A protein has these predicted regions:
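Append "and, occasionally, other polyanion-binding protein interfaces
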Residues: 17, 23, 60, 64-65, ...
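Pre-recognition alpha-helix immediately N-terminal to the DNA-recognition helix
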Residues: 43-47
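Short, amphipathic alpha-helical interaction segments positioned at domain boundaries
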Residues: 110-144, 148
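Positively charged, structured surface patches that bind polyanionic biopolymers
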Residues: 1-39, 55, 122-131, 136
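Winged helix-turn-helix DNA-binding recognition segment
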Residues: 2-3, 31-35, 40, 51-112
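Intrinsically disordered, low-complexity and often Lys/Arg-enriched segments
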Residues: 1-8, 137-165
């Protein structure tokens, strides 16, 4: 005996709870582009993704005062560094260049860009652009956190030593 489509949808909705959900594909979650993000860029990606709704991919704002300060951001410099990193990774796509009275807008790179009522600088897409697939980890890129040297202990000495290099 099989359930009807409506009953199956109702069961699926109950299983995930009543809240909205975000379509975050597993190939994106497992990608080198996502793995290489700094913690601030990862947080910003989630803050941008939290603005997503069906039919509005491309309409996410990173306005510091009106949107992101309430989400815990305290530094514009940190925000813009994380934003630059996300755009370079291809995980987000700028859909409108900001100006004096309009903020820049962004889309999630693993979803198709929607129309959003003629306020974007780019056309809607039928399928995702997936620029994040072309991301390559830069081995020459220095980490934002300094390398912490490994501390070695000699069993016959009471003080640890730090190896060279």
């Amino acid at each position: 005996m099989s359930r009807s489509r409506d009953a199956a949808l109702k069961v699926a909705k109950q299983a995930r709870g009543n809240g909205a959900f975000l379509p975050f594909r597993l190939d994106v979650l497992r990608s080198p582009a996502l793995a290489a993000l700094s913690p601030y860029a990862s947080k910003l990606l989630l803050d941008i993704a939290s603005q997503w709704s069906m039919g509005k991919n491309g309409d996410a704002s990173v306005a510091f005062e009106k949107v992101l300060r309430a989400r815990g951001w305290r530094s514009k410099a940190t925000l813009y560094k994380a934003l630059k990193e996300l755009v370079a990774s291809g995980l987000i796509i700028q859909t409108r260049q900001g100006s004096l009275h309009e903020c820049s807008l962004y889309a999630l790179g693993w979803l198709a860009i929607d129309d959003c009522g003629d306020k974007l600088d780019v056309k809607r897409t039928a399928s995702p652009l997936d620029h994040w697939r072309k991301f390559e980890v830069d081995s020459n890129n220095s980490s934002s956190t300094p390398r912490v040297p490994m501390v070695l202990k000699k069993p016959h000495l009471s003080t640890p030593r730090v190896p060279d290099g």
